[in-house]
Curated annotation (Swiss-Prot):
Pfam family, one: DUF2608
Superkingdom per UniProt: Bacteria
Signal peptide as annotated in the record: 1-17
Any one GO CC term of the record: cell outer membrane
Protein name: Putative outer membrane protein TC_0650
Membrane association type: Peripheral membrane protein
Length: 261
């Protein structure tokens, strides 16, 4: 009898784990139809940097920020110390710089999913102080997440959900979304998450697993196949003349003629 009870318990849907699927794509076209024709009441969540857009200059690109963090850590700073030291400068550069889309198909996909009355929003590690510049950047590519109408309870002050963007204010993805889900009266039938970093996709998957939410994680590698925007030598020139952020072309011209010396 005990064996029979254990067998029934193991087979019971109430104790089964939610399905998880993680895929890697070079272009959003590879998964667009899977997303659009998914009949579940899912949430589509997208990362911002290097998914919706990337910095158009070497200095405004996320790679400059990441390399700067690595440089400070090599000098003995903790990850938190490096972030706190570099973030204000990165934020100022974002106000000066410009952005460019990675794939024009992504805004089209977002619009189509929104037209299906599905929940679509962005999720970023960006700090709360970066909200204004983030909305300005999204506006330059005519991208809006204003439609989500989620009846969440009050959120902790460490995160913000504004105009359809969840600002996690975190070094690593995961906790911000977990806190947001904790505030929801009802959870989605499924979460589809798109990010260019594998470790972010895995962390969001862990959150979904804890909440028993079926999950499709999409590792978006399209930026790797584009001509690189971040070039260390160009970024150095732009940093020297950062009072007015130079384009990559202008910085390359200065570098070529050694005017940066």
């Amino acid at each position: 009898m005990r064996f029979l009870f254990a067998f029934i318990l193991l087979c019971s849907p109430w104790v089964s784990e939610a399905s998880q699927n993680i895929v890697t794509v070079k272009t959003i076209h590879e998964v667009a139809s899977d997303i659009l024709y998914d009949n579940t009441n899912y949430w589509l969540i997208l990362d911002i940097d290097d998914v919706l857009f990337e910095g158009a200059e070497a200095l405004s690109h996320s790679s400059w920020f990441e390399r700067s963090i690595q440089g400070m850590r090599a000098l003995g700073a903790s990850e938190k110390e490096a972030w706190e030291a570099i973030y204000p400068e990165w934020l100022a550069i974002q106000h000066q710089g410009s952005i460019k889309q990675i794939e024009t198909a992504i805004p089209l996909l977002i619009t189509k999913v929104q037209n299906q009355d599905k929940i679509v929003f962005a999720y970023s590690e960006r700090q709360l102080c970066a909200q204004n510049v983030t909305f300005e950047q999204l506006a330059t590519i005519n991208l809006s997440f204003d439609k989500p109408n989620l009846p969440y309870a009050s959120l902790p002050p460490s995160i913000s959900f504004t105009k359809g963007v969840l600002f996690g204010a975190e070094i690593h993805k995961g906790l911000g979304l977990q806190l947001f889900l904790d505030a929801q009266p009802d959870l989605p039938e499924k979460i589809i998450y798109i990010d260019n970093e594998k470790y972010n996709v895995m962390r969001v998957g862990e959150v979904c697993n804890q909440k028993n939410i079926p999950y499709l994680g999409i590792i978006y590698t399209a930026p790797k196949y584009l001509s690189p925007t971040y070039l260390p030598d160009i970024a150095k020139v732009q940093y020297l003349f950062r009072q007015k952020l130079l384009s990559n072309e202008a910085a390359a011209l200065l570098l070529r003629h050694r005017l940066d010396k």
